């Protein structure tokens, strides 16, 4: 009989088993891989890939992990099959040049049969068709009959990292759910009978460019056991979704929807499974610092959240619900990943924001798509799909998914064509790019040798003019007053790159002076943008290139300060923070980073203190060029999305910060002087921005602030230290005055409202009064409605107003006789508010609502009166 274990016990049992076999238990790597070329962690071996590829030495000979993974290539199959997921955990044991094939197979068998207690007769191993060694081990060492060992082709049982490099055969373990069907017809493709639960990869070859295989000096083992699959087997449930890893989330969603999973139809069960799977994905992604966006892994997150919301609606959930199911997921995952509980607030805030935003999109888009499908087209046109995307933010894949439910397809080619046409229109309308100059620069890059950059060590250098442009055309010479673009054979001028601005300075010749305002890079050519102040400049002229040293020093101070800022953010705010962009100028720095909430004032102060401490400690900075694999092995931070060559420049502030960076920096942190954060704000969904200053700019900033404080002291006739108390007193006085004004407004509203009693119209046994009051706030409106109903006796009162803030306010008050006739104030006023672009509700006898469009208020009130009179007569 198989062991009856929870998902958490299966995970811990696996790790403990291999720890007892000399493996070091390592924590799961982030879902955000170190390698910026990979979007998400998709396999248990990915964190060890540099070791398998020979790019990094292993710190231990044996390791075991439970690795969180996300794959979305089969997202449409999630919920449709028993075992497809976007989020899953891969339990793995790894050997780096230590044990190999025989030991890996023996331990996999021992774990399966003695620890998890799987019946041996239910386990079917597969091997690569040419791997006689593995076949013999299964037959002779383990004792599996030959006819049960399945030989498979390279497509199924041979692993490779690419067309060249380390590779090798693998052996997979399958569990047989129906052994009574016999061994004479073993078909591992029959996934209703067999489930692959453990894969053993034997990396023993290196494939060269000719496709030839040569034995590796150090042979490695890479294995993966699917946690969800093993849970299905040991817990005796029909699919992965009904294991204790996922089913509690499904039950939470079903409870919110008011349904029972077991009694639901297949379509409803599919939606519940999608919610159960995707919620685990989004919780882990946000916990690892990913925020929703329209690009890269941020878009994967956004798409998963949107699928959760939509499938929630498909099972009958009306409104927000995602944080409730996320809480169940967090409670399950925190056993192995405590960071999900630590970052609970961040996770739920991001989910709430995305859900609210998408609900608006979904309601509008589904309505329009429904209208399109009601016309019974053979296919949703590309233009219609693009209009939904462009006007309402309705994603193409969601249009495809909804259309597929009705048996329709979407014209993807037509969508792509409409998208391209819009992009072409945008490009043709964009007049800011000088295409002539750009074309000339591109031609220049094809004919001029790359510029030799000397600026890391030299601030002045001899140089020769390699090419010269004026007004987008290459010329042989240019005279005083000309705006020019100059290519030199070598230069100390830094070209704008990595967020750092280009250097300024001068080019001085025998009879010519050129002021350089900017330097850009076209391929590997440094283009110096400037103006000839004196003389004539010719191609071939020899010049002295001199950068503005004061400006460079300020830029360097700001650049090193930017590195310190990122280190401080990781230390103080969240270690998962990553750079999303930057600007390093002589007068300021700007740092964009992935984070979905404001950095608190207390954290800002702590960050400033930490950075100024590092500055005062006078850390020597170090730069070194090394292979990218070595840099990553040392822990150097890379910016996602940046493309790096085989060799990279590493800027290190020992013990503080280490980043891949091609910019210029101070030699010692003490050269920065001072650091001050000026602003912190959000600039996009999930992206925050800090603007800061360093060095002399801080003193200038403080002088300006000091002048402002002195001015305020004079105005308020208070010492600087007394200003907060003085302002607090004035605010309290203003608040008191506002309350008095509100009271007067309410009294005036009551006086005005009582003048409306004559407008009440009889409707059967009750009276109906619907009217608009000018400039009355919601509370005063509520008071007036209650007073009017009291005066009317039995009746219905609906009042509307547009207060000073410019939004619609509505109140409905119904007497018992009105309610007896089937009308409820909450539902009625909510429906009326929708006409004004809003909503609301409340009790049957008294309710409030609001709207965004004051221009629709008069029509909405007119409609309310007609409805009440018609229903109450």
Curated annotation (Swiss-Prot):
<keyword id="KW-0648">Protein biosynthesis</keyword>
<dbReference type="InterPro" id="IPR023033">
    <property type="entry name" value="Ala_tRNA_ligase_euk/bac"/>
</dbReference>
<dbReference type="GO" id="GO:0005524">
    <property type="term" value="F:ATP binding"/>
</dbReference>
<keyword id="KW-0030">Aminoacyl-tRNA synthetase</keyword>
<feature type="binding site">
    <location>
        <position position="559"/>
    </location>
    <ligand>
        <name>Zn(2+)</name>
    </ligand>
</feature>
<keyword id="KW-0963">Cytoplasm</keyword>
<comment type="similarity">
    <text>Belongs to the class-II aminoacyl-tRNA synthetase family.</text>
</comment>
<dbReference type="GO" id="GO:0002161">
    <property type="term" value="F:aminoacyl-tRNA deacylase activity"/>
</dbReference>
<dbReference type="InterPro" id="IPR045864">
    <property type="entry name" value="aa-tRNA-synth_II/BPL/LPL"/>
</dbReference>
<dbReference type="GO" id="GO:0008270">
    <property type="term" value="F:zinc ion binding"/>
</dbReference>
<dbReference type="Pfam" id="PF07973">
    <property type="entry name" value="tRNA_SAD"/>
</dbReference>
<dbReference type="InterPro" id="IPR018165">
    <property type="entry name" value="Ala-tRNA-synth_IIc_core"/>
</dbReference>
<dbReference type="InterPro" id="IPR003156">
    <property type="entry name" value="DHHA1_dom"/>
</dbReference>
<feature type="binding site">
    <location>
        <position position="661"/>
    </location>
    <ligand>
        <name>Zn(2+)</name>
    </ligand>
</feature>
<dbReference type="GO" id="GO:0004813">
    <property type="term" value="F:alanine-tRNA ligase activity"/>
</dbReference>
<keyword id="KW-0862">Zinc</keyword>
<feature type="binding site">
    <location>
        <position position="665"/>
    </location>
    <ligand>
        <name>Zn(2+)</name>
    </ligand>
</feature>
<keyword id="KW-0547">Nucleotide-binding</keyword>
<dbReference type="InterPro" id="IPR009000">
    <property type="entry name" value="Transl_B-barrel_sf"/>
</dbReference>
<dbReference type="InterPro" id="IPR018163">
    <property type="entry name" value="Thr/Ala-tRNA-synth_IIc_edit"/>
</dbReference>
<keyword id="KW-0479">Metal-binding</keyword>
<keyword id="KW-0820">tRNA-binding</keyword>
<keyword id="KW-0436">Ligase</keyword>
<comment type="function">
    <text>Catalyzes the attachment of alanine to tRNA(Ala) in a two-step reaction: alanine is first activated by ATP to form Ala-AMP and then transferred to the acceptor end of tRNA(Ala). Also edits incorrectly charged Ser-tRNA(Ala) and Gly-tRNA(Ala) via its editing domain.</text>
</comment>
<keyword id="KW-0694">RNA-binding</keyword>
<keyword id="KW-0067">ATP-binding</keyword>
<dbReference type="InterPro" id="IPR002318">
    <property type="entry name" value="Ala-tRNA-lgiase_IIc"/>
</dbReference>
<dbReference type="GO" id="GO:0000049">
    <property type="term" value="F:tRNA binding"/>
</dbReference>
<protein>
    <recommendedName>
        <fullName>Alanine--tRNA ligase</fullName>
        <ecNumber>6.1.1.7</ecNumber>
    </recommendedName>
</protein>
<dbReference type="GO" id="GO:0005829">
    <property type="term" value="C:cytosol"/>
</dbReference>
<dbReference type="InterPro" id="IPR018162">
    <property type="entry name" value="Ala-tRNA-ligase_IIc_anticod-bd"/>
</dbReference>
<dbReference type="GO" id="GO:0006419">
    <property type="term" value="P:alanyl-tRNA aminoacylation"/>
</dbReference>
<dbReference type="InterPro" id="IPR012947">
    <property type="entry name" value="tRNA_SAD"/>
</dbReference>
<feature type="binding site">
    <location>
        <position position="563"/>
    </location>
    <ligand>
        <name>Zn(2+)</name>
    </ligand>
</feature>
<dbReference type="Pfam" id="PF01411">
    <property type="entry name" value="tRNA-synt_2c"/>
</dbReference>
<dbReference type="InterPro" id="IPR018164">
    <property type="entry name" value="Ala-tRNA-synth_IIc_N"/>
</dbReference>
<dbReference type="Pfam" id="PF02272">
    <property type="entry name" value="DHHA1"/>
</dbReference>
<dbReference type="InterPro" id="IPR050058">
    <property type="entry name" value="Ala-tRNA_ligase"/>
</dbReference>
């Amino acid at each position: 009989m198989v062991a009856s274990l929870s998902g958490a016990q299966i995970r811990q049992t696996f790790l403990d088993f291999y720890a007892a076999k000399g493996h070091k238990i390592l924590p799961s790597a982030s879902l955000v891989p170190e390698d910026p070329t990979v979007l998400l962690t998709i396999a248990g071996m990915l964190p060890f890939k540099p070791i398998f590829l020979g790019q990094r030495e292993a710190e231990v000979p044996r390791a075991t992990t439970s690795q969180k993974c996300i794959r979305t290539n089969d997202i449409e199959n999630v919920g449709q099959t028993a075992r497809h997921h976007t989020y899953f955990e891969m339990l793995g044991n790894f050997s780096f040049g230590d044990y190999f094939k025989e030991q890996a197979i023996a331990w996999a068998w021992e774990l399966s049969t003695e620890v998890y207690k799987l019946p041996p007769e239910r386990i079917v191993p597969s091997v690569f068709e040419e791997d006689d060694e593995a076949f013999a081990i299964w037959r002779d060492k383990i004792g599996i009959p030959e006819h049960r060992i399945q030989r498979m082709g390279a497509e199924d049982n041979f692993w490779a990292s690419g067309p060249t490099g380390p590779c090798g055969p693998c052996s997979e373990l399958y569990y047989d759910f129906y052994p009574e069907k016999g061994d004479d017809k073993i078909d591992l493709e029959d996934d209703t009978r067999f489930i692959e639960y453990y894969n053993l990869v034997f990396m023993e070859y290196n494939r060269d460019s000719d496709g030839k295989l040569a034995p590796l000096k150090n042979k490695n083992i890479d294995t993966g056991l699917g946690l969800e699959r093993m849970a299905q087997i040991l817990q005796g449930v029909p699919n992965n979704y009904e294991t204790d890893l996922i089913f509690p989330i499904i039950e939470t969603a079903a409870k919110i929807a008011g349904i029972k999973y077991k009694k639901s139809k297949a379509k409803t069960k599919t939606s519940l499974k999608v919610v159960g799977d995707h919620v685990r994905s989004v919780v882990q992604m946000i916990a690892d610092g990913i925020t929703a966006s329209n690009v890269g892994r941020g878009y994967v997150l956004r798409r998963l959240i949107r699928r959760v919301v939509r499938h929630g609606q498909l099972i009958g959930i009306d409104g927000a619900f995602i944080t409730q199911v996320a809480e169940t997921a967090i409670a399950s995952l925190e056993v192995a990943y405590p960071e999900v509980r630590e970052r609970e607030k961040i996770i739920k805030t991001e989910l709430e924001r995305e859900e609210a935003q998408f609900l608006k999109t979904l309601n509008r888009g589904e309505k329009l798509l429904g209208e399109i499908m009601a016309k019974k087209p053979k296919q949703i046109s590309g233009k219609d799909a693009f209009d939904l995307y462009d006007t309402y933010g309705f994603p193409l894949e969601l249009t495809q998914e909804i259309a597929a439910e009705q048996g329709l397809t979407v014209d993807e080619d037509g969508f792509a064509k409409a998208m391209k046409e819009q992009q072409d229109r945008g490009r043709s309308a964009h007049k800011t790019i000088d295409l002539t100059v750009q074309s000339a620069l591109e031609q220049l890059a094809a004919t001029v040798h790359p510029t030799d950059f000397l600026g890391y060590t030299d601030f002045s250098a001899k140089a020769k003019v390699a090419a010269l442009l004026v007004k987008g055309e290459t010329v042989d010479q240019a005279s005083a007053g000309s705006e020019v673009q100059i290519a030199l054979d070598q230069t100390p001028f830094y070209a704008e790159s990595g967020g750092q601005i280009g250097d300024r300075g001068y080019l001085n010749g025998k009879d010519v002076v050129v002021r350089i305002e900017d330097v850009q890079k076209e391929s590997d050519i440094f283009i110096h943008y400037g103006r000839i102040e004196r003389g004539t400049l010719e191609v071939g002229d020899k010049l002295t290139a001199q950068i503005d040293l004061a400006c460079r020093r300020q830029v360097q101070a700001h650049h090193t300060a930017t590195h310190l800022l990122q280190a401080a953010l990781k230390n103080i705010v969240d270690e998962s923070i990553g750079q999303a962009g930057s600007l390093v100028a002589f007068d300021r720095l700007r740092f964009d980073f992935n984070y979905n909430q404001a950095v608190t004032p207390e954290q800002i102060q702590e960050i400033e203190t930490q950075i100024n401490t590092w500055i005062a400690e006078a850390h020597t900075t170090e730069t070194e060029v090394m292979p990218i694999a070595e840099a990553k092995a040392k822990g150097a931070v890379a910016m996602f999305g940046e493309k790096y060559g085989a060799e990279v420049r590493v800027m290190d502030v020992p013990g503080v910060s280490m980043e891949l960076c091609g910019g210029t920096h101070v030699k010692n942190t003490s050269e920065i002087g001072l650091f001050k954060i000026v602003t912190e704000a959000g600039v996009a969904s999930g992206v925050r921005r800090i603007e800061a200053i360093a060095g002399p700019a801080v003193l200038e900033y403080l002088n300006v602030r000091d002048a402002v404080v002195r001015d305020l002291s004079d105005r308020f006739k208070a010492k600087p230290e007394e200003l907060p108390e003085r302002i607090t007193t004035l605010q309290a006085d203003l608040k008191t005055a506002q309350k008095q004004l509100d009271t007067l407004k309410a009294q005036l509203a009551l006086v005005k409202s009582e003048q409306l009693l004559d407008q009440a119209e009889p409707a059967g046994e009750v009276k109906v009064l619907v009217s608009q009051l000018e400039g009355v706030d919601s509370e005063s409106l509520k008071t007036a409605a209650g007073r009017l109903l009291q005066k009317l006796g039995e009746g219905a009162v609906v009042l509307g107003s547009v207060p000073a803030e410019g939004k619609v306010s509505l109140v409905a008050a119904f007497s018992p006789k009105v309610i007896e006739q089937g009308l409820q104030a909450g539902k009625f006023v909510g429906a009326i508010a929708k006409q004004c672009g809003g909503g609301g509700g409340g009790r049957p006898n008294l309710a409030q609502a609001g709207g965004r469009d004051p221009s629709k208020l008069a029509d909405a009130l007119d409609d309310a009166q007609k409805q009440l009179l018609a229903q109450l007569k």
